[in-house]
Amino acid sequence: MKEKLTKALQALKHKTPLVHAITNVVTVNDCANSLLAVGASPAMCEAADEVFEFSQLAGSLYLNLGTLTKEQEMAAYLAIRGATLKGIPVILDPVACGAIPRKKATIERLGHFGRFTVIKGNLGEVKALAGLAARVRGVDSLDEGNDGLEACQSLARAYGCVVAATGKVDIVADGQRACLIENGTEMLTRITGAGCMAGALVAGFCGAYEDAFGATVAALLTMSLAGELAQETSGGELPGTFRAHLIDQLSLVDEALIEKRGRVQWL
């Protein structure tokens, strides 16, 4: 199965997919730089009178609901409609949907305008969308339960898409297949934007590789490996230094590293 992950990385480097991102103001620069680091081409286009047409030119669409304004909400409806009409992968990052009821209503409406290819959130967000009790604090998940796989599979079947829940162990499921990614570092929780960057990477990989399940696993593994390497560099235990090293290490993840250090449990 690791062969699929290396093929996904190769496809990303070869195709340089254009990722149309409508994301939050806190992490927009982080998302753009992470995409550039792995070889994708980010476009942070969110003007409502531009997104319908632009989404149809992209390799994938990334919708991040972190600081959702009314203008972004309208743009997201138009963008997902355009992307779905062209069969372009749509990646949803349902930031804070477990804490803010409006987010769940927005996600439901987005589902009327188009379809999701991947839903990527933390465990609390995934459980909230799946209709399960979730422990959250703002945008952060307090859940570390053993029902994460069940929540992912349930949500995947409900939406007919791939679902990924990030945490100490990342879970990826599509209603039939599932895996656990055991790489990563606590340092990723000490900077703003790691989750958003991971979501952006999922969009990048999905824009280059047809198997959305494999693309999602490859993206999250890339993020986790880069985090491990960033922590291991000089000063990597300091949040500011770690952030800078993280972007550097994203650019250095290759097939050999995935083969050597990737810890993926296929279920």
From Swiss-Prot:
Q: Which Pfam families match?
A: HK (PF02110)
What SUPFAM superfamilies does the record tag this protein with? Answer: Ribokinase-like
Give, as in the UniProt entry, the pathway in which the protein acts.
Answer: Cofactor biosynthesis; thiamine diphosphate biosynthesis; 4-methyl-5-(2-phosphoethyl)-thiazole from 5-(2-hydroxyethyl)-4-methylthiazole: step 1/1
Set out the biological process GO terms recorded for this chain's protein: thiamine biosynthetic process; thiamine diphosphate biosynthetic process
| Record InterPro entries | Hyethyz_kinase, Ribokinase-like
- Keyword match Hydrolase: no
Which UniProt key words apply to this protein? ATP-binding, Kinase, Magnesium, Metal-binding, Nucleotide-binding, Thiamine biosynthesis, Transferase
**Residue positions binding substrate:** 44, 193
EC numbers listed for it are: 2.7.1.50
**Family matches, as HAMAP family:** Thz_kinase
Record family assignment: Belongs to the Thz kinase family.
Job description of the protein: Catalyzes the phosphorylation of the hydroxyl group of 4-methyl-5-beta-hydroxyethylthiazole (THZ).
Q: In its UniProt entry, what is this protein called? A: Hydroxyethylthiazole kinase
Q: What is the source species?
A: Desulfitobacterium hafniense (strain DSM 10664 / DCB-2)
Q: Which gene encodes it?
A: thiM
